[in-house]
Amino acid sequence: MLIEDDTGFVLHARAYRETSLLVEVLSAQHGRIGVLARGVSTAKGQVLRAALQPLQWIRFSALQRGELAQLRGAEALDAAPRLVGQAMLAGFYLSELTLRLAPRQDPLPELYLAYGEARARLGVGAGLAWTLRRFERELLTSLGLGFELDSASDGQPIDPAARYELDPQEGAQRLLSERAGERRAAATGSALLALAADEEPDAADLASLRLPMRRVLAHHLGPRGLKSWEMLEQLAPKR
């Protein structure tokens, strides 16, 4: 299959043999695809190699043969955001999460748009925690793994004053326990309603979403977690 003038975001690139790269791209028309880019480590291939760096937005053509596509050409469509510190780790997280959960060769236009928006927010210094929670929500929804955020699994409306656990399959379940530890690990109703309405909540409510959303994602990821989680964990109090 010939892929012509598709656009995509580079999720990951690693060296292959002496002069090539294996690149994972989230494309607009074909979803996540693996691409073999030959000759990029030669003197003539430096411009192409620069276009295949993580977070870069590209236009590309390739010939799909089996699991890997053979890259025919690529060009950068903008300057990739120059991220440092926490923002750089957040960018790594977006890409790693997409790489792990998005199936290959399955068009996911909503995920493509969500990734592009999150990337743009990181580039302008928008709040990291809210950017990540919004992306997690959109990723789950685009993969058919999302659930209602404004109503509980029993059909009752979310109570802003209550706390909720997030079941990966059933959705929000009201927490009845009064134990402080369990309540701290549950999302506030206000936070869930804000996430449903795409309106950033206050800092305390926003912080309450991190662990419940992580549990949902961990369920779908399986026993192997994310490398970026290990790094972001050290920065959690600052986010």
Curated annotation (Swiss-Prot):
A biological-process GO annotation: double-strand break repair
Family annotation (InterPro entries): DNA_rep/recomb_RecO_N, NA-bd_OB-fold, RecO, RecO_C
Keywords: DNA damage, DNA recombination, DNA repair
One GO location term (cellular component): bacterial nucleoid
Described function: Involved in DNA repair and RecF pathway recombination.
Family label: Belongs to the RecO family.
NCBIfam families per record: reco
Name of protein: DNA repair protein RecO
Organism: Stenotrophomonas maltophilia (strain R551-3)
Taxon lineage: Bacteria, Pseudomonadati, Pseudomonadota, Gammaproteobacteria, Lysobacterales
